[in-house]
């Protein structure tokens, strides 16, 4: 065991050299603001991490947005309670911090800005002046950490009820129900909650009317079939026309990021499946890859291909549900029943391989739970023979229908500029003509070894274009699966590494030290080096990412989950104003979201 830990230290040193500390943007920033203006942090995120002064935040953000190859998308924004973090050597003193993750499409590079804050002065200026999609992220940061956002247009709770007290992601906020007093709903509390639910347009930034007429306000949801989950949209209407609307989320919030602080690195894997409950193994991929970056694990080729195969099966499964329910939202019922027949075949295949269906929790730190079963090739081959003809029938019978096209073409349309401003990813972004698929541009798990195309639209993302891109993505996923079938490598299904969890069984049968390692890693969890890592993947609905902070423990110090659906729902008002209520139903169907992905 001592030798294994020595090897791990050597691997740590190798990983520390993989940072983007020499990224050209660091030089550009120093040329503009001076060589001593920033603290550059060495991490395993693969992204330059730069600590900036609060007073310079907006100026630095504006500079990055106006560079020759600009950073045009605010990908993520959130906070961290730094008070209990022990491994902070070389970093600015901070009780709390806020990070801003920006993407440059032209450079295919990212940068992460961080601001250090003291507990007695928790405030940062709003980033909405530069990126409108900062709005929701800043609301959640204030809600979860109590960090004041100066100048924010509508700083209210977003995930929790308006009557909630406290800031849940602070380290001194309890993480378990048993740490709270028993809940009692008294008459006074019930009256308070009912009063908080009373709708007042002014509280949502809406006017009751004009000088000549009053507006009508309509609640769509939170229990409406076209809302695709527990989701409410408050509509401000002038007849059938939508003057404005406000999405109201949080009904499905489960505290997934807080749970990450109380689960071991290994035992958190099942929670990832339930972030976006249709994606299955696709959701496990970014988390496991981020943990493997922390550990310095390189998995065998067989593991990479198996992970890709399971991810593409779940991509097809999710896309089939999306396409069929979109058609149903427009008014046709039959395709849903056909699609569920096809999805059943996928679930049968997934169950044969993993033992589970919707939520396999099958990826492991350093590999997968077990090897592929005998006969998997036959099941996959039968599916690959079946599915292409079914796709052709969907397209011919439903998606080329003139009524469907009339209801969806030109509806909720936006261009590349709007997509980037709102943090849109996935098919919604590619429909605008921007060719950005993480599997191609930032390949992971061996995607660079597969031959497939990235479907791209003609410049405007409308409802119909988004759906048709998903159809073509299905065909490309079938291509990838065929290559997995034809080129599955031989070899182990787990990496031979001391932090592989659980370790290969043969290790536990050699001598007592390896058996002790197995016992500790399964019961308490593996101890990860104190570092930060980040991994994004092309998930079923857009880009999903995990940003993990380890403080040298068996559990994550901070687990940040960035989901695509959160950003996509924030964009709804800008895309649908001036349209009809019937157009909104089609638009919601074209986004491809589930509320668990939004609310986490």
Swiss-Prot record:
Origin: domain of life: Bacteria
A cellular-component GO term for this protein: plasma membrane
PANTHER family, per database record: NADH-QUINONE OXIDOREDUCTASE SUBUNIT C_D, NADH-UBIQUINONE OXIDOREDUCTASE 49 KDA SUBUNIT
InterPro entries hit by this protein: NADH_DH_suC, NADH_DH_suCD, NADH_Q_OxRdtase_suD, NADH_quin_OxRdtase_su_C/D-like, NADH_UbQ_OxRdtase_30kDa_su, NADH_UbQ_OxRdtase_49kDa_CS, NDH1_su_D/H, NiFe-Hase_large
Organism: Salmonella arizonae (strain ATCC BAA-731 / CDC346-86 / RSK2980)
HAMAP family to which the protein is assigned, alphabetical: NDH1_NuoCD_1 (MF_01359), NDH1_NuoD (MF_01358)
Subcellular location: Cell inner membrane
Catalytic reaction annotation: a quinone + NADH + 5 H(+)(in) = a quinol + NAD(+) + 4 H(+)(out)
NCBIfam families: NuoC_fam (TIGR01961), NuoD (TIGR01962), PRK06075.1 (NF004739), PRK11742.1 (NF008728)
Segments of this protein annotated with the region NADH dehydrogenase I subunit D: 214-600
Stretch list, region NADH dehydrogenase I subunit C: 1-190
Membrane topology: Peripheral membrane protein
Complex formation: NDH-1 is composed of 13 different subunits. Subunits NuoB, CD, E, F, and G constitute the peripheral sector of the complex.
Keyword Ribosomal protein: no
The name this protein goes by in its record: NADH-quinone oxidoreductase subunit C/D
Keyword hit for Translocase: yes
EC number: 7.1.1.-
Gene (UniProt): nuoC
């Amino acid at each position: 065991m001592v030798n294994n830990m020595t090897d791990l230290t050597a691997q740590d040193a190798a990983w520390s050299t993989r940072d983007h500390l020499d990224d050209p943007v660091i030089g550009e920033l120093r040329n503009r603001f001076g060589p001593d203006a920033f603290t550059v942090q060495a991490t395993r995120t693969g992204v330059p991490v730069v600590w900036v002064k609060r007073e310079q935040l907006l100026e630095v953000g504006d500079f990055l947005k106006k560079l020759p190859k600009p950073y045009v998308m605010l990908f993520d924004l959130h906070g961290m309670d730094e008070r209990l973090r022990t491994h902070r050597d070389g970093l600015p003193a901070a009780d709390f911090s806020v990070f801003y993750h920006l993407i440059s499409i032209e450079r295919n590079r990212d940068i992460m800005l961080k601001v250090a804050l003291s507990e007695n002065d928790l405030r940062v200026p709003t980033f909405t002046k530069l990126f409108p999609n900062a709005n929701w992220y800043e609301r959640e940061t204030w809600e979860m950490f109590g960090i004041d956002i100066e100048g924010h247009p509508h700083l209210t709770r977003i995930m929790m009820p308006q009557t909630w007290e406290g800031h849940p992601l602070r380290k001194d906020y309890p993480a378990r129900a048993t740490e709270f007093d028993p809940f009692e709903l008294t008459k006074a509390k019930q009256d308070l909650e009912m009063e908080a639910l009373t709708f007042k347009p002014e509280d949502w930034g809406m006017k009751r009317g004009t000088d000549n007429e009053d507006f009508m306000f309509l609640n769509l949801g939170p229990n409406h079939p076209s809302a695709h989950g527990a989701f409410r949209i408050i509509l401000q209407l002038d007849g059938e026309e939508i003057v404005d609307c406000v999405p109201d989320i949080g009904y499905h919030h489960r505290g997934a990021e807080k749970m990450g602080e109380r689960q071991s690195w290994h035992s958190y894997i099942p929670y990832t499946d339930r972030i976006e409950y249709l994606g299955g193994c696709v959701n496990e991929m970014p988390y496991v890859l981020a943990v493997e970056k922390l550990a310095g694990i390189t998995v065998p080729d067989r593991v990479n291909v198996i992970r890709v195969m399971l991810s593409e099966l779940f991509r097809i499964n999710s896309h089939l549900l999306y396409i069929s329910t979109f058609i149903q939202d427009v008014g046709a019922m039959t395709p849903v029943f056909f699609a569920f027949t096809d999805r059943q075949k996928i679930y049968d295949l997934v169950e044969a391989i993993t033992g589970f269906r919707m939520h396999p929790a099958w990826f492991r730190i350093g590999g997968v739970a077990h090897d592929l079963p005998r006969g998997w090739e036959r099941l996959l081959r039968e599916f690959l023979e079946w599915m292409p003809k079914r796709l052709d029938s969907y397209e011919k019978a439903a998606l080329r229908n003139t009524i469907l096209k009339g209801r969806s073409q030109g509806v909720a349309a936006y261009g590349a500029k709007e997509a980037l401003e709102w943090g849109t990813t996935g098919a919604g972004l590619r429909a605008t003509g921007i060719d950005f698929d993480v599997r191609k541009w930032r390949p992971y798990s061996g995607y660079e070894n597969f031959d497939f195309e990235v479907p791209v639209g003609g410049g405007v993302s409308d409802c119909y274009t988004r759906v048709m891109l998903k159809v073509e993505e299905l065909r490309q996923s079938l291509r990838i699966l065929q290559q997995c079938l034809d080129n599955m490598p031989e070899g182990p299904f787990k990496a031979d590494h001391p932090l592989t969890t659980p370790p290969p069984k043969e290790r536990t049968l050699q001598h007592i030290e390896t058996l002790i390692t197995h016992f500790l890693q399964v019961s308490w969890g593996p101890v990860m080096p104190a570092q930060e890592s980040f991994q994004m993947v092309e998930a079923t609905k857009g880009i999903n990412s995990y940003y993990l902070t380890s403080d040298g423990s068996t559990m994550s110090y901070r687990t940040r989950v960035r989901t695509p659906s959160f950003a996509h729902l924030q964009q709804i008002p800008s895309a649908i104003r001036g349209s009809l209520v019937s157009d909104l139903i089609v638009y919601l169907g074209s986004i491809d979201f589930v509320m668990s992905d939004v609310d986490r």
